[in-house]
Regions:
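Short helices/loops that flank or line small-molecule/ion binding pockets
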Residues: 24-35, 51-52, 121, 177-180, ...
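Hinge/lid segment of periplasmic solute-binding proteins
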Residues: 44-99, 113-117
Length: 204
């Protein structure tokens, strides 16, 4: 608030809202229940919002930062622009907040480093009832298809990006198969309570 006042001379009151999953936020906006100045969704939601004309162009003054322009901008802009729609570049509407944050958090007291190097550990019955998954269908789908295509990924015959954007009936059936096999191992689908479960050794 103080920074905004310093930059613009205007007083504002910040209202900060969080949502368990992207889709709840998107539904509120689509139904006209909420308007936001800034939202922080995952990339697939940015793509949906752009398709539905739910975004406004952003002020790009920040882009005059030499460090951003020389080190970060070229790669990030390329990735964001993959979400572009006809006549609309996504980088006019979005900037990157985090990148490549999906991974495995584990307790070394129960799970060796060598085991956690592969998504295979999630399907290991040894850890049944001690695994939490993010309550995100995108993350769950990605985990399943990456695991299912581990051999092809290693051989370089397919990329993660191609797998994540393949929603063909065959891809969906394969993801369903592996997620059903994973289900008995899952203790819960979490948005934020996972950290507490980890600290109490209720999840590994």
């Amino acid at each position: 608030q103080a920074y905004y006042k310093e930059q613009t001379g205007e007083n504002i009151r910040i209202v900060y809202q969080t949502f368990d999953i992207n889709e709840i936020m998107l539904t509120k906006i689509e139904k006209g229940h909420e308007d936001f100045d800034v939202v922080c969704p995952s990339e697939y939601i940015i793509e949906r919002m752009l398709k539905k004309h739910l975004l406004l162009p952003i002020d790009t003054n920040f882009a005059h930062s030499p460090n951003y322009m020389n080190n970060v901008a070229p790669f990030i802009r390329k990735q964001i622009n993959k979400l572009s729609q006809p006549g609309e570049k996504a980088s006019r509407y979005a900037v990157c907040y985090m990148w490549g944050t999906a991974g495995i958090l584990y307790n070394r007291a129960y799970v060796p480093d060598s085991v956690a190097l592969s998504w295979d550990c999630l399907w290991n019955k040894k850890y049944a009832g001690k695994i939490l998954m993010k309550d995100s269908y995108r993350d769950a789908y990605g985990t399943a298809v990456i695991y299912a295509h581990a051999k092809e990924l290693k051989e370089g015959t397919v990329t993660v990006e191609e797998l994540m954007n393949d929603y063909s009936p065959r891809a969906m059936e394969l993801a369903e198969k592996y997620l059903k096999a994973l289900k008995p191992n899952i203790a819960g689908w979490e948005a934020d309570f996972g950290k507490e479960m980890m600290t109490k050794n209720k999840a590994w």
